[in-house]
């Protein structure tokens, strides 16, 4: 099972809530939230595509350091385009697409967001809570 878990989707779709629910079930797991990384390590970046790619590269580097030490890592960020996903190396991650909303709260992100072609789990708005989704998501990690 892959140790790097990417939780991606539009802003406001529930990525961080799901990340916390998975973390609570898995216990000793490192989480990287893109908003926190952007407000500290990458506070100089804008939201241009070039800087979004740099943000994805940073998220990849951080998560790769965690998994190199034999830990699981959750990375919670929008990852809106094929270019940002390639920069993150998403095919070497367990990808969870949180697809619970049609539009996010930022128009510029809505305009560039491309639904992923590859994902392991697609979280939809079917009435289940983040905790219920998390229970289903973590099962293969321990089965």
Sequence positions of predicted segments:
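Residue-level preference for the first positions of well-ordered beta-strands
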Residues: 2-6, 28-30, 72-74
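Short, charged, surface-exposed secondary-structure boundary motifs
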Residues: 41-42, 103-112, 132-134
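Glycine-rich phosphate-binding loop used to anchor ATP phosphates in small-molecule kinases
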Residues: 48-103
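Conserved substrate/cofactor phosphate-moiety recognition/catalytic segment
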Residues: 19-62
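NTP-dependent small-molecule kinase module
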Residues: 5, 21-25, 91-94, 115-143
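Conserved lysine of the Walker
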Residues: 15
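The conserved Walker
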Residues: 10-11
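Short loop/helix-cap segments at secondary-structure boundaries that form the rim of catalytic
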Residues: 86-91, 106-107, 112-118
